[in-house]
């Protein structure tokens, strides 16, 4: 996303322009939970359409939140991973998950173990061990 596509110079608006759609942080969550391929992410419970997933992966890559490498045995297979920039989204995810767990606990049970793991990993070194 180039600077000309941002709505304003507001930090919140710019952040939402980059990761504020309903899929980007779920992709980041999946990568933090250990998913690495398009297929693994496509099979997530939320059911993202393949065209949307491809678009979000491209956008996250353009914005240097994720990167990828090709499998040695099959150039069509890409393994995605979080960059340093992507790893820093950890705190945003943690706070959104805490908020949801507090106010909508019945909707927050699927990833409670992940939330607990994130809550206990507070240093950057520890965050990398989550991935």
At which residue positions do the language-model features occur?
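Recognition helices and adjacent regulatory flanks at domain boundaries
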Residues: 1-10, 18-22, 44, 56, ...
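Glycine-centered, phosphate/nucleic-acid-interacting loop/turn motifs that mediate DNA/RNA or nucleotide
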Residues: 23, 64-65
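Residues within the helices of the helix-turn-helix
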Residues: 39-40, 58, 78
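N-terminal helix-turn-helix DNA-binding core of bacterial DNA-binding proteins
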Residues: 10-52
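C-terminal regulatory/oligomerization modules of transcriptional regulators
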Residues: 91-131
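Basic, amphipathic "hinge/linker" alpha-helix immediately C-terminal to the N-terminal HTH DNA-binding motif
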Residues: 20, 72-95
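Basic amphipathic alpha-helical segments that dock to polyanions
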Residues: 53-63
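Short beta-strand "wing" residues that participate in macromolecule-binding interfaces
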Residues: 68
């Amino acid at each position: 996303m180039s600077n000309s596509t941002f709505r304003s110079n507001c930090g919140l608006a710019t952040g939402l322009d980059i990761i504020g759609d309903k899929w980007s942080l779920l992709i980041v969550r999946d990568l933090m939970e250990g998913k690495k391929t398009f297929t693994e992410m496509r099979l997530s419970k939320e059911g993202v359409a393949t065209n949307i997933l491809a678009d979000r992966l491209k956008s996250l890559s353009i914005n240097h939140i994720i990167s990828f490498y090709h499998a040695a045995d099959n150039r069509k297979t890409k393994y995605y991973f979080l960059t340093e920039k992507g790893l820093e989204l950890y705190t945003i995810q943690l706070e959104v998950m805490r908020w949801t767990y507090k106010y909508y606990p019945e909707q927050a049970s699927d990833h409670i173990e992940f939330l607990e793991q994130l809550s206990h990993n507070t240093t950057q070194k520890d965050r990398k061990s989550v991935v």
